[in-house]
Design a protein with these regions (language model features):
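Bacterial signal peptide processing site
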Residues: 26-29
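Extracytoplasmic small-molecule ligand-binding "clamshell" domains
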Residues: 34-136
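Acidic, polar ligand-binding/catalytic clefts
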Residues: 111-173
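A ligand-binding cleft/hinge motif common to bilobed small-molecule-binding domains
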Residues: 138-145, 193-195, 223-256
Length: 312
């Protein structure tokens, strides 16, 4: 994802937005209902430490020699996408993806280095060798699988959110002529383009798609009523609702559920299989469930099997 405009009205920003703006996300969200706590969990759960993960020598042996020798995995991500990846009030990079990435690295006997970047440029940076993994709430789709390998780790969909009370009576079925905020590079951009085409084909006005570089800017647009609504991953929308104290609210149910994927540059031997094996091991030993609970992600999106290129 990525946006074109940054706003200076910091007094209006809740802590989650301020955190994202101090540094520089993919699409997803739950595709179905669930009974778990709202995205973001509680302050107590977010401060909980995830137990260290034991190294798996067999998986570690599958890591490329250059990465193993360096002792760390350089991970590209857009740190404006709470609760998945963001910067907290202490300036620390945190989130669901961060904790899972750390656990994956530990399983391979490595550490992590997270590098912040605009979402729309992360996969290109991965291909250019700038990163050794890309983990930033990327939805797995056929277009991305043409250029990278991807390991699934959570199933998410898209949610529609509006200012409190839905003053413009926005609904997913009628976005024609409306100002809808979205992060650049996300699957929601493509979704809105298709919906806008349907509008104009039926003689209605096109959707005014307002694209921004960071998800925090998208959230602020809706919170301050500069935009009439936004589309984003449902865990992210749920978190925005929680962190704004209800200044933003969800309309309808999440839709178009699809798996998030960890992106790996193609043609790196068994490296992708090592990542897949590490994620599966974390699912099997319960670490994955603990990370989901810490960040309050809906368990309906939890996977029992990590797959390599599941749509290929």
């Amino acid at each position: 994802m990525a946006r074109a405009t940054h706003f200076k009205a910091l007094a209006l920003l809740p802590a989650f937005a301020l955190a994202g703006l101090t540094m520089a996300c993919g699409a997803g969200g739950d595709g179905s209902g669930g009974t778990s706590q709202p995205a973001g969990g509680t302050a107590a759960s977010q401060s909980a430490e995830i137990p260290a993960v034991a190294k798996d020598p067999a998986l570690a042996a599958m890591v490329p020699q250059a990465i193993a020798a360096d002792g760390k995995i350089v991970v590209g991500q857009d740190q404006s996408y709470a609760p998945n990846e963001f910067v907290d009030e202490q300036g620390k990079v945190v989130g669901f993806d961060v904790d899972l990435g750390n656990a994956i690295a530990q399983k391979l006997g490595l550490t992590t280095e997270y590098q912040n970047a605009a979402f729309s440029g992360i996969l290109a940076g991965l291909g250019a060798g700038q990163y050794e993994l890309a983990m930033s709430s990327f939805t797995i789709n056929s277009e991305r699988l043409q250029t990278v390998d991807m390991v699934s780790y959570y199933s998410a969909g898209t949610s529609l959110a509006v200012p409190k009370g839905n003053p413009d009576k926005i609904s997913l079925d009628d976005l024609c002529g409306k100002n809808i905020a979205v992060q650049q590079g996300t699957v929601q951009v493509d979704d809105l383009a298709a919906r806008s085409q349907q509008c104009t084909s039926s003689g209605k006005p096109a959707i005014n798609v307002q694209q921004f570089q960071q998800q925090t800017d998208v959230n602020l647009q809706v919170q301050t009523k500069r935009s009439q609504a936004m589309l984003a991953d449902s865990p992210v929308v749920d978190y925005a609702v929680k962190q704004t104290g209800g200044a933003v609210e969800v309309v309808g149910e999440p839709y178009d559920a699809a798996p998030y994927g960890i992106a790996i540059k193609k043609d790196q031997g068994s490296y992708a299989q090592a990542i897949q094996g590490a994620v599966q091991a974390l699912i099997d030993d319960g670490t994955y469930a603990k990370i989901l609970a810490k960040w309050g992600l809906n368990t309906s999106g939890a996977l029992t099997k990590a797959e390599l290129n599941p749509q290929s």
